[in-house]
């Protein structure tokens, strides 16, 4: 059964890539010219290549993707194709894929969609001039982004995400943004760690008619509970 599901998942992804290719001009830097000429690296191949990239150099990744054929596109050809597609194109592909995956798996827990929100740092190429991502730590410092993600627990899929520079990250603002654009009609219960506690976040969730369970900081900390006279026992 697993291989059947994976095959169906691959079909859905390819359909989403085809859909993006049909409207690529909406997400191109130069809509009238980008992705219009026949290239060694087609639009669909470029998308598939990006999704399959691992931790190797671009040159080695290209050779692996094209089975080491002599006709494989050059590194500069890849760079040119990558520049043409705006980030919004990847955002469209992600949300289109998530939506269409619901046709394969749409499990609820007692009638509720269980959502979990958390964040994680990802190191990127060092660039001291990038004020959003450069962290002055150690001898040379480093660059990192913070990925905030909304996860559907029952269906094991990501519903949404928001990327911030680590130096200026704001997890509560990221959650508020994802909650505001959440459009699933199914009743939802959201769970999050104590980094997301705030009255503003509660207001966004209540306005969206979402139930939530958010871990709070201890009453002896500087969190919300510290302003209440609560007993220090069960």
Model-based region annotation:
Residues 1-234:
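Conserved, well-structured functional cores that handle cations and Mg-NTP chemistry
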């Amino acid at each position: 059964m697993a291989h059947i599901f994976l095959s169906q998942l691959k079909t859905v992804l390819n359909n989403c890539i085809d859909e993006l290719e049909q409207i690529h001009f909406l997400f191109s830097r130069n809509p009238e010219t980008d992705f219009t000429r026949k290239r060694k690296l087609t639009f669909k191949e470029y998308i598939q290549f990006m999704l399959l990239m691992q931790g190797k150099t671009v040159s080695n990744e290209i050779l692996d993707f094209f089975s080491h054929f002599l006709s494989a596109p050059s590194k500069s050809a890849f760079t040119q194709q990558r520049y043409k597609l705006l980030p919004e194109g990847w955002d469209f592909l992600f949300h289109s894929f998530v939506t269409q995956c619901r046709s394969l798996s749409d499990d609820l827990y007692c009638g509720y969609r269980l959502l979990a929100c958390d964040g994680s740092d990802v190191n990127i190429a060092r660039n001291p001039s990038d004020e959003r991502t450069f962290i002055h730590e150690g001898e040379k410092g480093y660059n990192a982004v913070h990925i905030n993600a909304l996860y559907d627990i029952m269906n094991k899929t990501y519903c949404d995400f928001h990327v911030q520079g680590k130096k200026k990250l704001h997890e509560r603002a990221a959650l508020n943004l994802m909650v505001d654009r959440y459009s699933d009609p199914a009743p939802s219960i959201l769970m999050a760690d104590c980094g997301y506690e705030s009255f503003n976040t509660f207001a966004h969730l209540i306005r969206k008619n979402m139930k939530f369970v958010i871990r709070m900081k201890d009453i002896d900390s500087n969190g919300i509970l510290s302003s209440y006279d609560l007993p220090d026992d069960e």
